[in-house]
């Protein structure tokens, strides 16, 4: 007679941004440590957890559809994440959901799992959970979340109402996690938060400790410390505070990647004021010029919103003029979409959908031309590329100018003598508006 006990199985659906992905990784790590098995199929699972996004209406819809699918396919569902902060909205559509928690409610999620699917008896030494925890990214790169929440009150955003005000992680904890990731083979660390440049503001940049040494809780100190790990370090979601200037020399010295993801959102001072964003375009252009003088290899990524309430053709033209002058490398553009609970919903002069669409097309056409010209400048040069995947046709990787999922790729046709995570030198032979093609040197 077998004495093998049933190992409870959990299904998991993770939606939304990299910050949500990190939350999912933490929950999955705890579940695996406790002896739960994580399975990819609804019908194999004793229960399903759905980690939701609620940032914009399309994300809410996607989350509600994912919850519905999990209920139809499995029946036992726990919901967490940003949309979980709006329990009534979920219950109205899906009253049969077992439990709902808000974002970063790890302990509550685990308690609910224990209630419906009791913890197994298991030997923790047999769980085989890697020291760096369960990761949902490829082994060679990982997201490092340094804080939760945001102190800004941008009128298009409801993140603070879902994730709260800024709470910085202790710098010693952040650096210890980074060290574990590198020890496990990670070659690229992507620093994320709602507002990376505000790291430490909530604790008045107090001094923490790592390996017995004092370290200031600030973005610049964090970058200095991460540079000692000998891997690529990439900064995301950097609000344009003045002290961002202090990380540019670190990029010029090769300590962190010369890559800055800095969401500017618009270029019209009037629209920026309505958004409650910093609004001096001339000052921002001067900073970009100065950054490039200090670090000529700097890649600038940004995101913008067109069709924000009150945006006139004159405002939009200011945005196009800014693009022409700034010549940013990587740009994302969103058509403004009302989000339940956002202050911008109450603003007058909502822009018609057909006008949003027309402006978005003009924006993208201009930026694609700029991007193509910027990438064409790299043809004939040698660059470093981190390999993401390899098949019989060759390898696909990313340059220092390319973050995973959101930027371009470098195609190495016919190159099969590499593996994911390898960093190789490549001569660029061709380019379009997003991607590069080249051969290994």
From Swiss-Prot:
Binds 2 [4Fe-4S] clusters. One cluster is coordinated with 3 cysteines and an exchangeable S-adenosyl-L-methionine. It comes from the Bacteria. Residues 376-441 form the TRAM domain. Keywords: 4Fe-4S, Cytoplasm, Iron, Iron-sulfur, Metal-binding, S-adenosyl-L-methionine, Transferase. GO terms for cellular component: cytosol. It holds the Pfam family Radical_SAM. Residues 8-118 form the MTTase N-terminal domain. Its main location: cytoplasm. The keyword Metal-binding applies. Its EC number is 2.8.4.4. One of its GO terms (biological process) is tRNA modification. InterPro entries: Elp3/MiaA/NifB-like_rSAM (IPR006638), Methylthiotransferase (IPR005839), Methylthiotransferase_CS (IPR020612), Methylthiotransferase_N (IPR013848), Methylthiotransferase_N_sf (IPR038135), NA-bd_OB-fold (IPR012340), Ribosomal_uS12_MeSTrfase_RimO (IPR005840), rSAM (IPR007197). [4Fe-4S] cluster 1 binds at residues 17, 53, 82. Its cofactor is [4Fe-4S] cluster. It catalyses: L-aspartate(89)-[ribosomal protein uS12]-hydrogen + (sulfur carrier)-SH + AH2 + 2 S-adenosyl-L-methionine = 3-methylsulfanyl-L-aspartate(89)-[ribosomal protein uS12]-hydrogen + (sulfur carrier)-H + 5'-deoxyadenosine + L-methionine + A + S-adenosyl-L-homocysteine + 2 H(+). HAMAP family: MTTase_RimO. Catalyzes the methylthiolation of an aspartic acid residue of ribosomal protein uS12. Belongs to the methylthiotransferase family. RimO subfamily. This is Ribosomal protein uS12 methylthiotransferase RimO. The gene is rimO.
């Amino acid at each position: 007679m077998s004495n093998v006990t049933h190992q409870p199985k959990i299904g998991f659906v993770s939606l939304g941004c990299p910050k949500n992905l990190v939350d999912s990784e933490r929950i999955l790590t705890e579940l695996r440590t406790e002896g739960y098995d994580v399975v990819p199929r609804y019908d194999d699972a004793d229960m399903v957890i759905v980690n939701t996004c609620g940032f914009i209406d399309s994300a809410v819809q996607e989350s509600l559809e994912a919850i519905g699918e999990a209920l139809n396919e499995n029946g036992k569902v726990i919901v967490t994440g940003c949309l979980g902060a709006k329990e009534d909205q979920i219950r109205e559509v899906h009253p049969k959901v077992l439990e709902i928690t808000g974002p970063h409610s790890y302990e509550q999620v685990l308690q609910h799992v224990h209630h419906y699917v009791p913890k197994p008896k298991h030997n923790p030494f047999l769980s085989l959970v890697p020291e760096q925890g369960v990761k949902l990214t490829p082994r060679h790169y990982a997201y490092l979340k340094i804080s939760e929440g945001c102190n800004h009150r941008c009128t298009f955003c409801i993140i603070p109402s879902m994730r709260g005000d800024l709470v910085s992680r202790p710098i010693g904890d952040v650096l210890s996690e980074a060290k574990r990731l590198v020890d496990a083979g990670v070659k690229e660390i992507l620093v994320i938060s709602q507002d990376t440049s505000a790291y430490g503001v909530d604790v008045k940049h107090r001094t923490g400790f790592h390996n017995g040494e004092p370290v200031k809780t600030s973005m610049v100190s964090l970058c200095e410390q991460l540079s000692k790990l000998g891997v690529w370090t990439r900064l995301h979601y950097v609000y344009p505070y003045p002290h961002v200037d202090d990380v540019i020399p670190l990029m010029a010295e090769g300590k962190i990647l010369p890559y800055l993801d800095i969401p500017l959102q618009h270029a019209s001072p009037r629209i920026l004021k309505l958004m409650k964003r910093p609004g001096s375009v001339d000052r921002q252009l001067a900073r970009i010029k100065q950054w490039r003088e200090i670090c000529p290899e700097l890649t600038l990524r940004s995101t913008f919103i067109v069709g924000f309430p009150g945006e006139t053709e004159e405002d939009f033209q200011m945005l196009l003029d800014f693009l022409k002058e700034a010549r940013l490398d990587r740009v994302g553009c969103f058509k403004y979409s009302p989000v339940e609970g956002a202050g911008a919903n109450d603003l007058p002069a909502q822009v018609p959908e057909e006008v949003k669409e027309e402006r978005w097309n003009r924006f993208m056409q201009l930026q694609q031309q700029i991007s193509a010209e910027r990438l064409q400048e790299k043809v004939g040069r040698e660059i470093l590329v981190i390999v993401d995947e390899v098949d019989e046709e060759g390898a696909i990787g990313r340059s220092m100018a390319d973050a995973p999922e959101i930027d371009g790729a470098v195609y190495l046709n016919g190159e099969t003598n590499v593996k994911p995570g390898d960093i190789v030198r490549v001569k660029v032979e061709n380019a379009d508006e997003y991607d590069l093609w080249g051969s290994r040197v």
